[in-house]
Amino acid sequence: MARRSRGRFIDGIVLLDKDTGMSSNFALQRVKRFFNANKAGHTGALDPLATGMLPICLGEATKFSQHLLDADKRYLVTAKLGQRTDTSDSDGEIVQTREVNFTQEQLDTALEYFRGETMQVPSMYSALKYQGQPLYKYAREGIEVPREARPINVFELNFISLEGDELTLDIHCSKGTYIRTITDDLGEMLGCGAHVIMLRRTQVAGYPYDKMVSLKQLEELVAKADAESLTLSEVLDPLLLPMDTAVSGFKEINVSDELATYLMNGNPVQVANLPVDELVRITIGDARQFVGIGQMNDDGLLAPKRLIVLREPQD
């Protein structure tokens, strides 16, 4: 007998403002529970120390979470100078203390080094896997394993302030960039060591900062629904962003209802102005209803790659 799914069918993206001190998975499970969603997934973990934007995909939106994982990110970070820790943040143990003594010119030179395309060796305290196990598990056992340097791109690195031994920076970077590693490397370049004491993700892709919602706000809305006999769809669903915002940067290909029937059954179709080697966003008819993403196949036809199940949301 087929297992019945639990929770309601609800599709969309929640821009969660994650609190400090909790794992991304804990935050994900809380959001899933509040919305009573049958399916949920996040789009790239934030460290427990970190706060800020954590897009949570519900329902069919989970099919496009990888595209947000691959998106550019922006962070506000404060580093404590003069102390290096084993995790490169304040959750770790202090392993070295040094005097803070550098000039503004030396700081400017060091910051310039990190701008643009560089290679970065990931921290041992990361979720990257080696032989099927996350690096942080090896690190906790005192085992260091080989890590390959990976290309990253820091599009912007802006100096915000230097107050005493606390340096605050604004960093706009590509996927896979470890801010803790930049902070640790910067501290070594300055000769004093450094570690992260505050990290806030302020942007993922082009999502607006003011659309974020906290777990506390969600909890209050659920309590309101209970107190006023309202449905979750009435109090929570207005917070959801459309699932196609995860692929809003893709070119739109609008097809007729007739062609859509073929596409939705997994068949490629002939369309005009189809870009080569690019994923496209597929919409249907005058209403431009989003149904998924596709790509040109070897025959020059639009082939579906990932399609959604069209259904009505539940209360």
Curated annotation (Swiss-Prot):
GO biological process, one term: mRNA pseudouridine synthesis
Catalytic activities: uridine(55) in tRNA = pseudouridine(55) in tRNA
EC number: 5.4.99.25
Transmembrane domains' residue ranges: none
Gene Ontology molecular-function annotations: RNA binding; tRNA pseudouridine(55) synthase activity
Enzyme class, broadest EC rank: isomerase
SUPFAM superfamilies with a match to the protein in the record: Pseudouridine synthase, PUA domain-like
Active-site residues, as the UniProt record annotates them: 47
Top-level lineage group: Bacteria
Keyword line: Isomerase, tRNA processing
Secreted among keywords: no
Family assignment from sequence similarity: Belongs to the pseudouridine synthase TruB family. Type 1 subfamily.
Function: Responsible for synthesis of pseudouridine from uracil-55 in the psi GC loop of transfer RNAs.
Name of this protein: tRNA pseudouridine synthase B
Organism name: Shewanella pealeana (strain ATCC 700345 / ANG-SQ1)
